[in-house]
Amino acid sequence: MSTTVIGSWADAGDEFSAPDITTNPDGTKTVITYRTNQDGKKVKITQKIKEVKVQERVHPLIAQRKNWKKYGKESKSPPGPDTSTTQLGEKVELKLGTSWKQQEKEEEEEKAENRAQKLSVQTIRCRTCGGDHYTSKCPFKDTLGATTSSPAAESGAGDNGPGKYVPRHLRADANGNLPSKEGRDDSTTLKVSQLNSFVDEDMLRNELFARFGPLQRVTLVRNRETGDSRGFAYVSFITEDMAQRALDALNGKGYHSLILHLEWSKKKKTV
């Protein structure tokens, strides 16, 4: 059997008769058509179609507008909007009611509850310098904590009676001194005072000290209760020479309407 190559499916459809449509007792229609598949063979296609009418209830004015006749260049266009000349907007559902005040009140209460939940979240705050780290890991515990730890040392030294427990970190040595943090080198740390209230760590790092060399840390001392700046900070460099250059260049200079005062966090021993 010889097969013919089909150049166009539209031409191939003309070789067969019109579709055979049969109406069934249940109201459906059976449509039988013949086509040629990709292999060049004649196939029979049977389709069973059921027509369903869907009624849509609309406002009488909307139904009246749909029956308006089009005019002008759109006079010959079919019913409905033409996408080439009409831009369809977003469908907006308008809900009317008398409880809008109650809805606004509920929304305000929900916002207030969310704000209260955000404020109730506890943040880490150092009791020594006010930074966002634990008090036990404060980098300036030896410098700022000396005044707060001395009363505890005195009480620990004077209350060594029977039944009194003194924590290890509050026990004084033979000379009456508290144990300090071992292995810590603050020889490259500067204390910067007389800072404006809005100055933060990033401003100190980027605007003042980054040009003198790499920084180990920049800590702005804040109020324990409010979190506001207390007007001074500690800046640690990699080497002592970098810290000395920053001290010589910035001490006594103006910065945001105030005169900076720089000094070593620990006094240098004079030889």
From Swiss-Prot:
Locations listed in the record: Cytoplasm
Record PTM Phosphoserine, positions in chain: S77
Pfam families: eIF3g, RRM_1
Region (Disordered): 1-26, 63-119, 147-187
GO cellular component terms attached to this protein's record: eukaryotic 43S preinitiation complex; eukaryotic 48S preinitiation complex; eukaryotic translation initiation factor 3 complex, eIF3e; eukaryotic translation initiation factor 3 complex, eIF3m; multi-eIF complex
CDD domains associated with the record: eIF3G, RRM_eIF3G_like
UniProtKB keywords: Cytoplasm, Initiation factor, Phosphoprotein, Protein biosynthesis, RNA-binding
Main localization, broad class: cytoplasm
GO biological process: formation of cytoplasmic translation initiation complex; translation reinitiation; translational termination
Database matches in InterPro entries: eIF3_g (IPR017334), eIF3g_N (IPR024675), eIF3G_RRM (IPR034240), Nucleotide-bd_a/b_plait_sf (IPR012677), RBD_domain_sf (IPR035979), RRM_dom (IPR000504)
Occurrences of domain RRM (ranges): 188-267
A GO molecular-function descriptor: translation initiation factor activity
The family this protein is said to belong to: Belongs to the eIF-3 subunit G family.
Subunit composition and interactions: Component of the eukaryotic translation initiation factor 3 (eIF-3) complex.
Function: RNA-binding component of the eukaryotic translation initiation factor 3 (eIF-3) complex, which is involved in protein synthesis of a specialized repertoire of mRNAs and, together with other initiation factors, stimulates binding of mRNA and methionyl-tRNAi to the 40S ribosome. The eIF-3 complex specifically targets and initiates translation of a subset of mRNAs involved in cell proliferation. This subunit can bind 18S rRNA.
Annotated protein name in UniProt: Eukaryotic translation initiation factor 3 subunit G
Organism listed in the record: Scheffersomyces stipitis (strain ATCC 58785 / CBS 6054 / NBRC 10063 / NRRL Y-11545) (Yeast)
Name of the gene: TIF35
